[in-house]
A protein has these predicted regions:
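Bacterial Sec-dependent N-terminal signal peptides
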Residues: 1-20
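Short aromatic-enriched loop/helix-cap "lid" or pocket-rim segments at secondary-structure transitions
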Residues: 125-127, 175-179, 283-285, 329-335
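Aromatic-rich peripheral "rim/lid" segments of glycoside hydrolase catalytic domains that contact
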Residues: 315-317, 322-336
Length: 336
């Protein structure tokens, strides 16, 4: 009798724990491609979010290492503003404790897309910092797949987790040497060479990571974050197990043929992981919120017009405005 009672308690506890975890899936039907959460269609009204006070950067802000009272105060201030503007998902990088993903979701109804940078900004391998990630190396592959496994174990049962995101325009990182924007080579042969020699191993490894995630967690989809559509043909060949194509795209007021190209090349849902415009007008050397609003409204209009069932490309599942706080800390960041 006692054993039966203990089994019942364990069953109720397990059921309650997993009942809190949302079932998120990608659905493709006659209407098009869409994201579905717990059986309901879900359009991402997203925001790139982090908490970096004035005078700090991503390295020394250490927000998640503060006391719970400080973290809660910061989240309550930020998330109340985001909720008021109908944001339903924020993009966060790894490092956020699972309990705060849960807190944000349960108090404000805002999900988290959890982003592993996947070597975008370098790795520490065998105790040595390597600023440029070589994805064809066995030790790099082992390290990243091990990190992904640890990540999924830690977060897969977290209420408020929407999906996993791999990378941050890592295809650009194949050319750039740091976090700041640099020029691309003009030589198309050089670009193609980089794509084949460095890009293909990276995308292949991303696909291996996606397979590992989905083997461990069947309730949350996996996306990659690519820079625009550079190397999309390689993505089509190597990333067949990735659920969603995420892209950082800055083309001005219109995404032009982005929806059509992604549909024809990949036949996967399209998610804008970054887009938008600055509030600072470099020509006028002054703040210009009206100009920013013009670009943002135009971009969001296209994102919605291309959602499932609206008779355009039917493959848009939403996007993440870039970004909630200013990024002035990035200037000179690589000169530390």
């Amino acid at each position: 009798m006692k054993n039966n009672f203990l089994r019942l308690i364990l069953l109720l506890f397990t059921t309650a724990m997993f009942a809190q975890v949302d079932k998120v899936s990608v659905v493709s039907n006659d209407e098009g491609m869409k994201l579905v959460v717990n059986g309901k269609d879900f359009m991402i009204n997203g925001m790139n979010w982090d908490f970096i006070p004035i005078g700090t950067n991503t390295v020394d802000a250490n927000f998640w290492n503060k006391s719970d009272d400080i973290i809660k105060a910061g989240l309550d201030t930020e998330m109340s503003l985001l909720k008021n503007m109908n944001v339903n998902v924020i993009r966060q990088y790894t490092g956020v404790p699972a309990k705060w993903i849960k807190y944000i979701y349960e108090k404000y109804g805002i999900y988290t897309m959890l982003n592993h940078s996947f070597g975008r900004y370098g790795l520490t391998l065998d105790g040595v910092w390597t600023p440029v990630t070589i994805y064809s190396e066995a030790r790099t592959q082992d390290y990243l797949l091990s990190e992904i496994e640890t990540l999924v174990k830690e977060y897969k049962n977290t209420p408020g987790l929407l999906m996993y995101l791999l990378g941050n325009e890592n295809n650009y990182g194949l050319f750039w040497q740091g976090a700041e924007t640099e020029d691309f080579p003009d030589d198309q042969e050089r670009i193609n060479f980089i794509g084949e020699s460095r890009g293909r191993p990276m995308y292949k490894l991303m696909n291996e990571a996606a397979k590992k995630i989905k083997l461990m967690d069947s309730t949350h989809p996996v996306a990659i974050c690519n820079g625009d559509v550079l190397f999309i043909d390689i993505v089509a060949e190597e990333c067949k197990d990735v659920d969603i194509y995420g892209t950082n795209t800055y083309r001005g007021a219109s995404f032009t043929d982005m929806f059509k190209v992604v549909k024809e090349k990949l036949n996967k849902p399209l998610m804008f992981t970054e887009f938008g415009a600055d509030a600072f007008n470099a020509i006028k050397n002054s703040e210009d919120q009206k100009s920013q609003a013009y670009y943002m409204v135009s971009n969001w209009k296209e994102i919605y017009e291309n959602a499932a069932g609206l008779a355009k490309e039917d493959n848009s599942i939403g996007g993440f405005t870039f970004q909630f706080s200013d990024g002035w800390w990035k200037f000179g960041f690589d000169d530390r």
